[in-house]
Amino acid sequence: YPGHLLYLEDHTFRNKGPAIVGMRVLGGRVHIGQKIMKLDGTPIGQIKSLRTRGSEDVKEGRQGEELAVAVMGPTVGRHIEEGDEFWVDIPASHAKRLRKLDLTPIEEEILEQITLLHRKNDHFWGR
């Protein structure tokens, strides 16, 4: 599923290996195993785990939830900063299938933004 995340201020729990940071799901959904990218399309890393405020492991985060997200790849302060926003990086083959599903209007908007971003480099992405 498409998703939009915000890295919360003062919510850095570990800097790297994996980086564990507090994030709010601004729209859509986020799952373990998904890759995330900056709003300009720069790849960041892969989500390894999601935890709620009560330290409970979850498989999925939905819009409005605040989670501790373990991301393999980036170093806080070098690759990502507090206040950064991210998209879930969807593979082109999944974008085709997602269009056929019953997405919420916000999820459709996020998918459209991700599609536009990828089509700058590949005109046929997700078709």
Q: How would you label these PLM feature ranges?
A:
Residues 2-127:
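Beta-strand/loop-dominated core regions that host nucleotide or nucleotide-derived cofactor-binding catalytic loops
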